[in-house]
Amino acid sequence: LGCSSQLFAQSKYEYGPVSQRQEGVPQGKVTQHRWENSKVFPGTQRDYWIYVPAQYDKSKPASVMIFNDGGGYVRENGHSRAPVVFDNLIAQGKMPVTIGIFINPGVIPAEQAGGKPRRNRSFEYDSLGDLYARFLIEELLPEVEKSYNLTDSAEGRAICGLSSGGICAFTAAWERPDYFTKVVSYIGSFTNIRG
């Protein structure tokens, strides 16, 4: 039994064709940003990235997909390579022009020099209620909309996450079905719910 698990652990994951750069497919642009002005999660700081496909036209509202724990999804060498997948699927006409928003959970800076920052991930992701949905709807998405034309249709909005990010995605859509109709919860940690 131990041997077989070691064999699986040593197997190299191979990306499928849609996760690899394809010749002739236009590449979108990814920009990194920092959010430090949250009223919903005061005192937190977080990085987020915006992916804009090459086919984006400001005169037409784009669909939007939010990724919790976004840093893992946005990296070219990450587990999902989401921008590459988006480039390929949009070019193939298999998904609409979609802006990706990749959000890391908040961090509360150290109070003293040499201290460690406090991660706010469990509070933001594992709590039931509308706080995270409010953070997105009232704070972060309006900031992104200053630069990009995002759809106002719930049918054109999706949210996803892995583990605690998955329960967070589910909870945001549960609390605001008028805002999110598509949810991807990869092995959502429904047992980590704070109560």
Language-model regions: role of each:
Residues 8-195:
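Non-catalytic cap/lid and distal C-terminal segments of serine-dependent acyl enzymes
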